[in-house]
């Protein structure tokens, strides 16, 4: 049976224990390699959905930020892959968001861009690096489109130095600038099970949850 690519929306049950979170990327890579071997297509496209947002009151979602980060890392681990970010459409009390149309449209962007070579931005902002200089952290992004912006024109939310306490951040051209007293080890974004992080690109596609090292 010929197929053009693979779409995957899975992971809720894997995101409940840290051991399963940590092994998810490697297991996903093995799964994709197996599919590619069976179809004799070493670059068979693989596009997947990053978990949305969930509250921890009615669901065991404490590790969802770490799991979303492991999914982001899969973009480097698995060739010819793409990730649909959906942290902005989750429900606090429902592990399965009902807005599947938006999920499908975001997956379709990856297929249109990478498989069918359409001139379309496939993703929301993905971090490419963070640097510290003279009391400021500067974060660069891919897939910013015509520029970064705040969803709904509100105050920019979602950044922290420890994954817990939110800190102010501002958009400067296609970068995020954060004033700090000293260089931190990491910078976090959207590091909550149910996140209100609101950075998007010019296509109104949301930025991924991330934890990246701050270089100097």
Where are these regions (language model features)?
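Cell-envelope and extracellular/periplasmic
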Residues: 1-216
